[in-house]
Amino acid sequence: MKIGLSTASYFQKMQIEDAIPDIGAHGVPVCEVFLNTFSEYEPAFVEMLAQRLSAASIEVFSVHPMSMQFEPQLFSIHPRQRADAIALFERVLSAGKRLGAKCYVMHGPARLFGGVKNIELTRIAPIFMDLAERAQRFGIQLTLENVSWCVFNEPEFGARLQALTGGAIKHTLDVKQAVRSGYDPMDYIRAVGEHIVNVHLCDATRLPAGGVRYDMPGFGEYDFVSMFNLLGEKGYAGPAFIEVYSDMYAQIPTLYESLSRVNSIVSRSCYGNESH
């Protein structure tokens, strides 16, 4: 299992075009590119990123846009809203294709405490299918990420979506968001593990007085060995990315200490005989 970094972990610490050379300088073989805003979808900007990625010898596995900028409107009942959102979606897919990404990480519709209408699974499952087909035209697999405030916040939702879409939709497992939703990440693996193709890592420690402290991967108490072993049982063969909020660490070297600790954890799991 390769352990990489998401450029999202550099948010407000370093711009994406500067984060890429930094990742390469540390010998990290693979990354997830987080595109922050519309200007970063522009072909000239994407081309500059592609050149820097090539110079740094970094593989891009996945692309992840700032979801709330357009993804909820992909599921809108208003045709113009949806058409404009699809145009933006396809701009990101085009960017992902140029960067060599294999996967698109999607949040999908927000729940917003039940205040959003028209997100019944029977209505949106065909939309997911359409979006997956559009992504495939760019050579990219659509993956729906579990997110505490979006439609896929409970493991059962993923299982129901799979039943309705015949396995066409794959998933990104996000450890932090699983815990925020009140679940163990392994609950999602049990529900949709055969369809997980991407993993976001963050650590979590249960506090004696209740609540959770989120940590850099390898700095907390989450049982990653068991999680990796369960992924292995489900046939997972992809990478995993350190994807944390940038206010969780003070200095960039902490990212690489975290990466080193995660590689050590991986070596104690079923993936331990692989090179990474």
Region locations from a protein language model:
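Catalytic-core regions built around general acid/base machinery
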Residues: 45-56, 127-134, 226-230
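N-terminal pre-domain/capping segments
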Residues: 1-97, 166, 170, 194, ...
